[in-house]
Amino acid sequence: MVSRVQLPPEIQLAQRLAGNEQVTRDRAVRKLRKYIVARTQRAAGGFTHDELLKVWKGLFYCMWMQDKPLLQEELGRTISQLVHAFQTTEAQHLFLQAFWQTMNREWTGIDRLRLDKFYMLMRMVLNESLKVLKMQGWEERQIEELLELLMTEILHPSSQAPNGVKSHFIEIFLEELTKVGAEELTADQNLKFIDPFCRIAARTKDSLVLNNITRGIFETIVEQAPLAIEDLLNELDTQDEEVASDSDESSEGGERGDALSQKRSEKPPAGSICRAEPEAGEEQAGDDRDSGGPVLQFDYEAVANRLFEMASRQSTPSQNRKRLYKVIRKLQDLAGGIFPEDEIPEKACRRLLEGRRQKKTKKQKRLLRLQQERGKGEKEPPSPGMERKRSRRRGVGADPEARAEAGEQPGTAERALLRDQPRGRGQRGARQRRRTPRPLTSARAKAANVQEPEKKKKRRE
């Protein structure tokens, strides 16, 4: 009897993760989490790169098989939170590296119906990766290691990442960083997060990557500048209010008794309805909830200097330098207190219409100039067909000068025109030959029972 080969646990879990039944897949995800915790707790334990690639193969098809939107979101959150089950930073980075390599490998096989849920999975994994840094206190070394991993697997020229993965990663990076660390990160730390993008934008020869980084990173920073400054001013006002409240607490200690007794006396009687008005602090809190959340803070002058340092190198391509210099000017204006002016839709529409009118006027002037150069105001000679139609309308003998210029005799032109014209009644301008009746003999006149022409003449006389 042949003994059955025992498969490694990673392969068994991958097979169950890619199963047809949802119950089997959910159970496999729970077992995988327990297996990761148990294996990484041991000193000699851990996963190899190949083992994690097999695990991610099963997780990829586990997400592939999930077809309900709410369940897709729940499964994506569960899969992305597996990074917290690893007990060491090296194992976490290896897990993230295997994820991005799996996405790069399988991206071209994803159809458009399943594309959105994998976009969501990428966003959730990036969010949990940044939460790992937050739990570690935003250590500089951990930040550098994670950014190096992401740049190597996604944006580096030697990476095998498709354009869809690159574009989506650049688009969501600042959004997820804002969600996780906008309340804690300083301007210097934020500069470290965007520093790899500065290097890639200055070195890359891919115009798509350059355009995505410029629009998704640098121009987003410029657009969010008013919100960032407003957020900073609100934070400073809050700190001033806290300091003022701490200083007033000591002076208000003796007056609390009188205030409490006065409030008791001003209470409405029982059974009456009193509509409370919101206080100023509550209104401010409501406005803060209605407005957007915190925004990343940047030192615009430091960002401009860093970009200028990378763009001014001799190895930087000319098109990259030209594009980055435009962004540098905007950042320098922000550092000097000049904000970019947003065009009002009415003004933009008016400017567009004026541009169209100017183009139309230029086109008309160009056509008029060409006509003047061609004939200096003279009319172009008509075509032979048009000349024939005109001659039919006015008759051949009406224009003897044109007939003389053509070198034809009057009789010849008339005969040629009559030969070309169709025979029929109602032809305008056609010359018909008059028929002269032949004189009837007496015998023929009697047979036809008509009088002779001579007798008719006598009667008419």
From Swiss-Prot:
Annotated transmembrane regions: none
Residues with Phosphoserine modification: 245, 247, 250-251, 383
Modified residues (Phosphothreonine): 412
Record PTM: Methylated at Gln-427 by N6AMT1.
Entry-linked Pfam families: Nop52 (PF05997)
Region (Disordered): 239-295, 354-461
Keywords: Methylation, Nucleus, Phosphoprotein, rRNA processing
Compartment(s) of residence: Nucleus, Nucleolus
Biased composition (Basic and acidic residues): 253-267, 371-381
Highest taxon of source: Eukaryota
Major place of residence: nucleus
InterPro entries (UniProt xref): RRP1
Tissue and organ expression note: Ubiquitously expressed in fetal and adult tissues.
One GO BP: rRNA processing
Effect of mutating residue 427 to R: Abolishes methylation by N6AMT1
Biased composition range(s): Acidic residues: 239-252
Subunit structure: Interacts with C1QBP. Interacts with RRP1B.
Function text: Plays a critical role in the generation of 28S rRNA.
Listed name of the protein: Ribosomal RNA processing protein 1 homolog A
Organism expressing this protein natively: Homo sapiens
Protein encoded by which gene: RRP1
